[in-house]
Curated annotation (Swiss-Prot):
Pfam families: MAT1-1-2. The gene is matA-2. Residues 1-22 are annotated as: Disordered. To P.anserina SMR1. Coiled coil: none annotated. The lineage of its organism: Eukaryota, Fungi, Dikarya, Ascomycota, Pezizomycotina. This is Mating-type protein A-2. It comes from Neurospora crassa (strain ATCC 24698 / 74-OR23-1A / CBS 708.71 / DSM 1257 / FGSC 987).
Length: 373
């Protein structure tokens, strides 16, 4: 046997190592390529959404500043930690907060809808830009929480009864557009173990349109021990209407001159209300200032009544249409505001100042960016 001419037998183990090394290198190359593709897609998305992103960032900075001012005006302990002795501190502007929040909602809807389109139609996770999607979503939720605090629960802070020494949550409560009053007796009822009830229209707690004369006419005596009621009152024991349903009044002649104008305006608003109806939009779709958001959320929760952090229980007042608006909350609002269409968030903010019990989530038509009041 010629040992010199014999070739050594190759081992199979180095070959396996080489294959594993090659596959590992190939996987790393694919991962790098995917990262570059995602970066390119994110750049492309941000270039398309540049105006919306710029508007969102500017308004979010403005909203953070306004939220700080609002907190400092409510709790003085935040003033020194955030503003120190500088002259930057000033008074908060509720109107500016509402308009800025509405602008944030509009710009974030544009961003989130575009990223959602890329995710559904191109198969890109988070639309190719997860950081942008999270920033837009959390900024939008922050704007919603501020709006909810300033609008939905505004009446809870200004609920009637303070002049009588009544405490909100203990003696008076607002629920579904009605002012609930707790009786002095310890009677077990349906709300909080107390006898919560809606007072008669003549009660000082009740709000009726116009002046106190409405309450006088509400129990106008027409003879034969019968009363004429101008307001429906389901809470009253004798709410069933009996006797004459009309009485005579003197109307100034000047009212006839504005009849046509008022009628045409009423018809225009009624047409808008009928044609558009009450569109129920989808819930807000699923933003980097995490620490600031958490800090502001905590401060708002402990300082402002009605500010509800995401995930906490809350009372939601639903906008159910003109015909179902209770008489208590039909005052101090032009009828044209209750059913109108605006196409800009600034105008929507103007309307929200009057609609104290309107859920902003019910006013955003995300795809068309039309706001219904």
């Amino acid at each position: 046997m010629n040992l010199l001419n014999m070739q050594p037998k190759r081992s199979e183990q180095p070959a396996m190592f080489e294959e594993n090394r090659a596959s590992s290198q190939e996987g790393q190359d694919l991962e790098v390529m995917y990262k570059k593709l995602h970066q390119l897609q994110a750049r492309l998305s941000r270039s398309v959404l540049s105006e919306a992103i710029k508007e969102f960032e500017e308004n979010l900075r403005c909203l953070f500043h306004e939220a700080k001012l609002l907190l400092c005006s409510t709790r003085t302990k935040y003033r020194q930690s955030w503003f120190g002795s500088s002259n930057e501190f000033g008074s908060s502007d509720e109107r500016r907060i509402i308009k800025t929040s509405c602008c944030i909602i509009e710009s974030t809807n544009t961003i989130l809808n575009f990223l959602s389109f890329l995710e559904k139609n191109r198969g890109l996770p988070f639309g190719g830009d997860q950081r942008l999607q999270q920033a837009a979503y959390k900024g939008q939720q922050f704007a919603f929480r501020l709006l909810r605090s300033l609008t939905l629960h505004k009446a809870a802070q200004e609920v009637p009864g303070k002049d009588f020494g009544l405490v909100y949550g203990k003696d008076v409560y607002v629920l579904n557009g009605h002012i609930l009053h707790r009786s002095k007796q310890e009677i077990v009822g349906q709300a909080g173990g107390r006898n919560w009830h809606v007072d008669h229209t003549l009660h000082p707690l009740r709000r009726v349109p116009g002046t106190p004369w409405h309450k006088f006419f509400g129990n106008l005596e027409v003879g034969d021990d019968k009363q004429l009621r101008l307001f429906d009152d389901d809470a009253a024991v004798d709410s069933y209407r009996v006797g004459p349903q009309k009485f005579f009044v003197v109307i100034p002649e000047t009212a006839e001159f504005i009849l046509d104008e008022v009628s045409s305006e009423h018809q225009r608003v009624a047409t808008i209300h009928t044609e558009n109806g009450h569109v129920q939009p989808p819930a807000p779709t699923s933003i980097q200032q995490e620490a600031l958001l958490r800090k502001l959320d905590f401060a708002m929760t402990t300082s402002l009544p009605g500010y509800v952090v995401e995930g906490q229980p809350e009372i939601v007042f639903h906008h159910e249409g003109l015909r179902q608006i209770p008489v208590d909350y039909s005052q101090e609002r032009p009828l044209s505001i209750l059913s109108h269409v605006f196409t800009r968030p600034a105008l929507w903010g103007e309307g929200l100042e009057l609609a104290d019990h309107f859920d902003p989530r019910d006013g955003v038509q995300q795809e068309e960016h039309i706001y219904y009041i």
